[in-house]
Amino acid sequence: MPRPKILLTNDDGINSGGLWAAYDAMSLFADVTVVAPATQQSAVGRSISIFEPLRMNEVTMHGTQAYTVEGRPTDALLLGLYGLGLRPDLVVSGINLGENISFESITTSGTVGAAMEAVNQGVPAIAYSLQMNDEGNKFADPRSHTTDFTQSKDVVTKFTRLFLEKGMPPESKLININIPAEKIEGYKVTVLGERLFETSVEKRIDPRGKPYYWINGTPIYIPEEHSDVTALRKNYVSVTPLSMDNTAFKACPELKKMILDID
């Protein structure tokens, strides 16, 4: 029986330890091709480069042939599918350094964005993210710190094999999985939490007296029994099925009534 084929990408870039931890876990039971951004691309969402050319380079990383794309995670995914002609059974994005939970985060996450684009192109996908105790390590040079991926690799192995063998659940071709930084208490199927940050903008002045700005976010916690945010805070692996259809169906009947008043 042929081994399943997986296209592996991320948003932290080709040098990320999380990417290669996922590769190490999945290459034991699948043929994995790595196509990842050349540099850090966090928080770019599902954006695509349509106004600039993209370059893809073949490299050897950790003794493995891989491909780097000078672009965004979605660019890497598309070049893997259409530039290299890959026909994967599954796309895996991650392991991201830092959780991707709540409505707020998944729409900006490059990790989830690449997985969404895979589903848009007809390929089921899983996005894996690891909670970080040290928030500064989310965007630090991956070569400047070490992260223990032992239990993350175990999660990746179990869930990737599960969905390869049994297929995706009805009504969802995209699974968002978040792994706690501490010892895992178990697994929970969750829904998206409301918010993760209280957004603010910080104004600063450069040496020439001109203003510039940083967008900040102070973490907040809204208790919701079945949310991914709550599960992760309690050290459970959060497993959230996502849908590509953003239609607010419950609003349609009332909206139909409202537009009757338009001349």
Curated annotation (Swiss-Prot):
Its main location: cytoplasm. Gene3D superfamilies: Survival protein SurE-like phosphatase/nucleotidase. Its cofactor is a divalent metal cation. InterPro entries: SurE, SurE-like_Pase/nucleotidase, SurE-like_sf. It is found in: Cytoplasm. It is an enzyme of class 3 (hydrolase). It catalyses: a ribonucleoside 5'-phosphate + H2O = a ribonucleoside + phosphate. It comes from the Archaea. Keywords: Cytoplasm, Hydrolase, Metal-binding, Nucleotide-binding. GO terms for molecular function: 5'-nucleotidase activity; metal ion binding; nucleotide binding. GO terms for cellular component: cytoplasm. Binds 1 divalent metal cation per subunit. Transmembrane segments: none annotated. SUPFAM superfamilies: SurE-like. A divalent metal cation binds at D11, D12, S42, N96. Its EC number is 3.1.3.5. NCBIfam families: PRK00346.2-1 (NF001491), surE (TIGR00087). PANTHER family: 5'-NUCLEOTIDASE SURE (PTHR30457), PHOSPHATASE, PUTATIVE (AFU_ORTHOLOGUE AFUA_4G01070)-RELATED (PTHR30457:SF0). Nucleotidase that shows phosphatase activity on nucleoside 5'-monophosphates. Belongs to the SurE nucleotidase family. This is 5'-nucleotidase SurE.
